[in-house]
């Protein structure tokens, strides 16, 4: 029999990892096209509040998920217009998107702070007290399984489909891709909006399952961790998933150390997972000799030459 505390740690790890991985996977798609989006934090927040408001007002979880995903994707389209169409600085646009997303979600969600959901994303299988690893896996809600499916689909798409090859070509050398007849603007626009949709799904998971309520700034820097996970995973879906599991484990473990007799400052408990993540990224970069595997054109706007 596995210790109940270890099963609780595993359950908390999977929940934290799911939230991070979905957002990171969306950012991976966006960056594969050569677009850097630092607005993930704001997009998660927009999806979270939109989904929560819809769930409170309609009691329809399916509709809440759809609204959250579409709202975040629409919000990401602002970044697409600014950076892909208008060719403006991607870093500045992303930072503004984060600030705007957090402020906007706080504004429209102020009347929903403290409200409770009558219904939320439930586990796919009704297992109240898991007693083994299999039951822990089966007790997760549907977005956990969707995340696994998305990982497989995205990995296959990037390697084996025309859309994946277009993303790769545009992200590595947009001018060469354009010369071959690929529509660089369209590809980058779609990739950016897809990234927003994934961030919205992460936000919906946050407010409809992970912590089923709404309050200001509840994303708590998870968008930035998602960005770091893309780098950690070398722009590979499976490696990014492993990174999400690692950070999810750290996020779940640190608060539990106190139950094992470790006396920790509460501020240290809050920031420890983020500090450890930064250290891992630094060590990984040093180990790789500074080579991260990033798309060569990332962050560089595409200007079509006259032909």
Question: For the regions a protein language model found, what residue spans apply to each?
Answer:
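Single transmembrane alpha-helix segments in multi-pass membrane proteins
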Residues: 8-57, 65, 70, 74-91, ...
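Hydrophobic alpha-helical transmembrane segments
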Residues: 10-13, 42, 62-70, 92, ...
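Hydrophobic core segments of alpha-helical transmembrane domains in multi-pass membrane transport
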Residues: 23, 48-52, 102-106, 144-157, ...
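Short loop segments and helix-boundary regions at transmembrane helix junctions
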Residues: 32-36, 77-128, 220-221, 225-238
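Transmembrane helix-bundle core of multi-pass membrane transporters
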Residues: 90, 101-160, 262-269, 295-307
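Helix-loop-helix "hairpin" substructures at the membrane interface of multi-pass membrane proteins
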Residues: 136-214, 237-242
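Cytosolic-side transmembrane-helix boundaries in multi-pass membrane proteins
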Residues: 154, 172-186, 257-307
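Transmembrane alpha-helical segments in multi-pass inner-membrane proteins
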Residues: 213-274
